[in-house]
Amino acid sequence: MTFDDKKGLQVALDQAKKSYSEGGIPIGSCIISSDDTVLGQGHNERIQKHSAILHGEMSALENAGRLPGKTYKDCTIYTTLSPCSMCTGAILLYGFKRVVMGENVNFLGNEKLLIENGVEVVNLNDQECIDLMAKFIKEKPQDWNEDIGE
């Protein structure tokens, strides 16, 4: 793990904690360029905004605003949890070359598809990410199941 990965995951984890404190699903994400500029950050807001699509990664993209697509090719997207199918699609669409996740214990997303498409996938197995997500799933299983399409 590099300093950049620690920094990036901490930004994403802070977003996850913010979502949890708002009564939402504790998944956070951020987009950091190669010069360590945070271009966008966000958290899952499906509950807070009654949204079908505002997962953590989608929220970070939304909050980055309108940027040229090529911008993302030089960025790493950090997420506290393995990306789902929808977020994986967005990662591939915008050409991210690197994804760093906090964990994939509570949910195993589409890491294989990312790797098959040339994206570097790094799993930090962060215990704080694992514990926060597990706590939420235990407290609100119906909200979690809705978030993952079950």
UniProtKB/Swiss-Prot annotation:
Required cofactor(s): Zn(2+)
Species, as recorded:
Candida albicans (strain SC5314 / ATCC MYA-2876)
Ranges that cross the membrane: none
Record localization: Cytoplasm; Nucleus
Function in brief? Catalyzes the hydrolytic deamination of cytosine to uracil or 5-methylcytosine to thymine. Is involved in the pyrimidine salvage pathway, which allows the cell to utilize cytosine for pyrimidine nucleotide synthesis.
Q: Keywords in alphabetical order, please.
A: Cytoplasm, Hydrolase, Metal-binding, Nucleus, Zinc
Keyword Transferase among record annotations? no
The protein's name = Cytosine deaminase
